[in-house]
């Protein structure tokens, strides 16, 4: 993982104990995951947790170098996708 992704992952683990798992580097046709600049924060069916995490990340874009998040769109209903610089 990139330094920003690693820092965000650690923050999420420490702040949100309800998170089921966090995916990072994996093969994909887009470069974000293979390059280690994306996380998938798995929240299962807890939409409130996903809302809280997404809002928190959006409020700290500078801290983690957030480029964008995906939540409640395009099959992102059981996890929050975050791409960082």
What kind of region is each of these model predictions?
Residues 1-80, 84:
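Secreted/periplasmic proteins that engage bacterial cell-wall peptidoglycan
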